[in-house]
Amino acid sequence: MGRLKRGGFIFVWWKGDHTPRHVHVYRDGSLVVKWDLDNQKPMKGEAPRPVLELIAELVSEGLL
């Protein structure tokens, strides 16, 4: 399991979890979005622009 806090959001992912590769994003203990990393679209919830920017940053850093 990976867990990272950035920009006021908590990003949680599991290695070997079911496909597609995805990340859960929380703020204040509530799920903001479950984001499909392979297809670049929400699986649940909606992703505000700051979350999309942070996901792109984390992917470019090799963290997701």
What are the residue ranges of the model-derived segments?
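Metal-centered catalytic cores of metalloenzymes
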Residues: 1-21, 25-64
